[in-house]
Amino acid sequence: MIAIIVQTLLISVSVAMDAFAVSIGKGLTVSRVRPGDAVRSALWFGGSQALFLILGHYAASAFSAYVTAFDHWIIFGLLAFIGGNMVHEAYEEDAENAKETAQFDWKHMLPLAVACSIDAFAVGVSLAFMATSVPFAILCISVVTGLFSAAGLYIGRAFGAHWQKPAQIAGGVVLILIGVKVLLEHLGVIAF
């Protein structure tokens, strides 16, 4: 039980890294962060993560009867791909992120929230095949993402772009490691 909670928390932090990195970028562009901006950011990113997790979970649940024999490979493949992509993107980002507009209306936040939640869809697919409480995972991931995005605004304002790349790399590596853990458990190499 504790291993499942820890795994869910690690996934939550990892999936939140895109929103955290984008929020740091937004924080770089403001002279001060208002509490309302932080709340809006948290709601946009956390809510979008929850929606995409639910969509991914239901999409996978519809096909779970057909893929249970190789679900561990799906989990591993998705998490390794998402994690690898996060690490790759951290090295590919340019000054464009730092110049992101600091507006917090729906026209600016919706595309960012959706872009940061694409990975959540794949994680939602993975949740359908993992031994975890899906409602708890969705709640945990969306709350952690909301908190990280709000904190990212303040961190971006205070410290600049220094933390953006390491956060994204760390999130990617953790997702890859969780994928490896799930694969090794299903293959009987390790037991948790």
Curated annotation (Swiss-Prot):
TM regions (residue ranges): 2-22, 41-61, 62-82, 109-129, 136-156, 172-192
Molecular-function annotations in GO: manganese ion transmembrane transporter activity
UniProt-annotated location(s): Cell membrane
Keywords of this entry: Cell membrane, Ion transport, Manganese, Membrane, Transmembrane, Transmembrane helix, Transport
Signal peptide: none
Lipid bilayer topology: Multi-pass membrane protein
Major localization listed first in the record, in broad terms: membrane
HAMAP family: MntP_pump (MF_01521)
Gene from which this protein is expressed: mntP
Pfam family, one: Mntp
GO CC annotation, single: plasma membrane
InterPro entries per UniProt: Mntp/YtaF (IPR003810), Put_MntP (IPR022929)
Native organism: Bifidobacterium longum subsp. infantis (strain ATCC 15697 / DSM 20088 / JCM 1222 / NCTC 11817 / S12)
Protein name, entry field: Putative manganese efflux pump MntP
Keyword flag Transmembrane helix: yes
The protein's role, per its UniProt record: Probably functions as a manganese efflux pump.
Source organism, top-level taxon: Bacteria
Similarity comment: Belongs to the MntP (TC 9.B.29) family.
